[in-house]
Amino acid sequence: MKDFKQYIEGNLGKSLKDCSKEEVYLALLQFTKEKSAALPQNNGKKKVYYISAEFLIGKLLSNNLINLGLYDEVKEELEAAGHSLAEIEEIELEPSLGNGGLGRLAACFLDSIATLGLTGDGVGLNYHYGLFEQKFKDNQQDAVPNVWLTPESWLVPTETSYKVPFGDFTLTSKMFDIDVLGYEQSTKNKLHLFDVESIDESLVSSDSIAFDKTQIAKNLTLFLYPDDSDEAGHLLRIYQQYFMVSNGAQLLIDEALAKGSNLHDLAEYATVQINDTHPSMVIPELIRLLGERGIEFDEAVEIVSAMTAYTNHTILAEALEKWPLDYLEKVVPHLVPIIKELDARVKAKYEDPSVAIIDEHGRVHMAHMDIHYGYSVNGVAALHTDILKESELKNFYEIYPEKFNNKTNGITFRRWLMHANPELAKLLDETIGTEWRKDASKLEALKAYRHDAIVREKLDKIKRGNKKRLSVYLQEKQGITVNENSIFDIQIKRMHEYKRQQMNALYVIHKYLDIKSGNIPARPITIIFGGKAAPAYVIAQDVIHLILSLSELIANDPEVSPHLQVVMVENYNVTAATHLIPACNISEQISLASKEASGTGNMKFMLNGALTLGTEDGANVEIHELVGDDNIYIFGEKSDEVIAHYEKGDYNASEFAQRDAIRPLVEFVKSDALLAVGNKERLERLYHELTTKDWFMTLLDLEDYIETKERMYRDFEDRDEWNAKVVTNIAMAGFFSSDRTIEDYNRDIWKLN
């Protein structure tokens, strides 16, 4: 095989050491694309089409080199010529195709589908500016377009194009592909990203994400989740969703026909995984397309119901999409009669209005359509699936118990261990052998080393090295200096009240006041946040403002700053995560119990040797079961208790706000000290929210949270015992490999050859 050095010499006519970083990057990108282009596609009879509004794939250069088995070789060649692969990788722009856990999960799943040699492609949209790039200005979030599309990217233009009909016009699509490589696999899959031929980037200025939301032919794929605080925003999201599923459905039918399907047997050639409710219109669209090709309505419904499966990712009512019928009449009038007929069939069979597709207010419940007309409904962690069956979707579970199943989420160890933490991967190879790279369950062999002083010392050294690396990264990106000898306590996830970043911020206030009164911690503490708030989500932006204001206040206080530091990472993304996660000591997983479907950050931290501070929520429950009581720090009320509070309506924030331990903390939010660096309107609004509404019960768990976190800080000082817990966590993380998750999906749902 021609190595990279020869490739450079042959293509650029000069030696590797004479090339600039940019030349090396562009050549390495092309070299890797050519290697992956040469691989044949997986081509089983049946294919899974994983349709998702988001694919948070991260930078691909190192990931693809690892999966091609070329990473070490290329790294050594570069080093020998005076280059650093890490520096070369810095030049790569991160694709802006997702935002949170939903998109990152989709990316991990594609990696695992390819690694297992299964035939499965992703289907999504080619967003030009993603969600947005986050900047901080005046201690507030500022959103600007996240530019990532350049001529030199992983996107490969294709000849595939479809006509997508809307109410008043038809748009022509253009399909771009990104190769999805499996780990040490000789085949590949694809991520298909659809764009509009008529897109117009000039609608957007460089310093704002505002744009004309009515010019659909020009704006359709500009942004992920465009602001939907008005009707134009709602309509644009429906246009986007239909454009995505119509292209996916047309592609799926074409590919099945090419393989010999007569369409009556389409379910033998294709299965569609609906990732959250955004792709739900694929059901009526497939029925429509089959009808156009001469298949009777009843049979079309039967075919589609045998080939669509739905993953529920949330129990938050606001996230289960319900579109007004009159909006659908405007955007996709040709689907409305189909949806009405599907609804009529449900209503003829079941009198219970709570299971109708169209409710009494004329809103179409997308999840209801998915459940009635799909063959599988899965939750993404054991607790989440139980809540779906016992409360949120109880009425559906009673009708279709056989459709419901759990598929606990997972993460790809290629990116989150081999790439993000190569020193730890090397230690694992030396200690337990390399089998874990292909079979994550083999990590459990590490348990035998819990009391091995040499292994614990090596783990400690690796953690210190990763803290140093993060410290350099934060200095380069934001000019922030952190104390590498401090405890790194990290909460990184999208900003949402149910994830309770505000509770962590109240802890910061507690610690600040504690230090001011003379209680100096045994070791300095660095509390790090990262995450974006949706532009229309005011309270989440207020929480960011509180965190940034506290950061400034503490940094300027010579009494407190040597002992406590607060950092908010700007524009948190996959790249930032690969620096933050390996450096972490304490993993904050503090959502209100019952609200987080699964979480995958908790798994990434566990795998990289952080200990979890968490509620009994989502996959924290399964982490707790795997590692045992002594190796995790659990606090707060349990999900059944929380659900009971909601049912009885007996949680009163204002009563909790008056408690002796809580009052000084919430009052500080609108104190003169904070107002000196903060915005009065934002801080007072947040104070009012916390002390009168507090819908996600921050104050309910706050005292237990503070006590548990303080205990964790004390335990950190017993380094041997702490590192023994770290060993157990890493050893038990194998269950959370996305390879295991995908094996489960395939065995129970997709049944690919």
Which functions belong to the PLM regions below?
Residues 1-753:
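A conserved ligand/cofactor-binding region detector
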